[in-house]
Amino acid sequence: MRRNNENRTKSRRQQEQSVDPAALLDFVTPTEFVELPSKGIGYPSGHPLHNQETIEIRFMTAKDEDILTSRSLLKKGLALDRLIDNLLVDKTLKAKDIIVGDRNAIIIAARSSAYGYVYETKVECPNCGNKQKHEFDLSKADIHEPLLGEDIKELDNGNYAVSTPYSKIEVEMRLLTGRDEAVIFKLMNKNKEGDAILSTQMKLYIVSVNGHKQDNVIEHFINNVPAAEARYVRNAYKDLAPTIEIKGDFECESCNHEQELEVPFNTDFFWPDR
């Protein structure tokens, strides 16, 4: 009789252990729709975000926090990509294929839903170098949508074309994505002074020059075009690139210097006190 009782107890324990944990916690991780600064403009036809104004993400969990503390992912600059990939509801999307401004909107939304809109971090005074705590309000985001001037043509492939004012050279440009950010991240790690970042960015977003897509042609244009025309191209890209910024008025406690500061969107954005 005792053996039968032991068998029944063992069987009951095995059944309890085999229960799906998700069934015990009868809820689904909530999701939210994030407004895209690009409004879906700048993505080629066939891209999941082409002409889409929002993107659905789920709320962060403790498992997602583990990604942001992974030393190997942080060292390789892959932590934010992995986090965004995890949060995207549409798994056909990849973080590396999302325009930079839209990625930043996702990062702000994820951080806000996880920890609230108040972002307290240490900032360094640009004038004297003093470090002090400062609060930013994540609910007050400044969104810059793509600005199409009269001299900018939107192409069928999602790219843009602009003609330089003096040489009348037609430059085709595309918007930078997470894939391009990874290239810039590696370059900045190698070159701590940040030299050649502007020219590297131009090499990444310029698709063709007068219809020529060869790398050597694009590099020749960047290295030899008059500075005024290079600046014209960079300003045109700046107008086209959708961005989302979090800024706040800063006053130094040490030297009383006043300046508007902007929040950088990196892994420290989630762990400011780490």
Where is each model-derived feature located?
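Long C-terminal interaction/binding lobes of large macromolecular proteins
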Residues: 1-274
